[in-house]
Amino acid sequence: GIDKGDYAVFKGIPYAKSPTGDLRFRPPQETEAWEGVRKAQEFSPKCTQRAKSSSFYEKEFYSEPQYQVPMSEDCLYLNIWTPAPSSIAPPLYPVAVWIHGGAFSSGYSSAISFDGEAYCKRGVLLVTINYRLGMWGFLTLPELAEENGDGTCGNVGLLDQIAAIRWVRENIAAFGGDPENITVFGQSAGSMSISV
């Protein structure tokens, strides 16, 4: 991660296996532990989407060059902003998980508008997540339903969100977060996801 003094940022942490090859259009699979130290200093690629967001989103959320990232199908990563430990801090910080908007077809977790510094200053740990978008996250085909065995397919973008929240619950204590005090919130498609 990156030590910012009052807080630390851990970028590009995988919460599921890469959804490529045989895992494309499939529910997210639990990631395997990695060997050694993961630096977690660079944002991951954003999930594959249209090359340019709508002018509103481009202007409001994704205009800062240092927060722009390449696209890739290998995109199931999250970012964590955590307050620095202090003698007056609670044993574990409350956790806020942010789900970005973008009409389920655009957006990403590392946009400047979703930076967690302000949350850390208030004693809240922030997590932002990527999830599959457009046809990569919501394609429904009879062939895919047949392969699943239960007759269902599609909505893997929503399953990605569930997998990310599950990862947070299982691992956030290692970053100073309270797994029993998690609030999920979002904007546009992100807030709609929470109500499903």
Protein language model features and the residues they cover:
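Non-catalytic accessory segments of hydrolases
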Residues: 1-158, 179
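Generic structural signal for well-ordered alpha-helical scaffold segments
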Residues: 79-82, 169, 173
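Acidic/histidine-rich, metal-coordinating catalytic segments
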Residues: 99-101, 184-190
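Active-site-proximal structural scaffolding
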Residues: 112, 161, 187-190
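Alpha/beta-hydrolase fold nucleophile elbow
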Residues: 156, 168, 175-187
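Short, well-ordered amphipathic alpha-helical segments that serve as non-catalytic structural scaffolds
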Residues: 161-169
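Short glycine-enriched nucleophile-adjacent loop
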Residues: 191-196
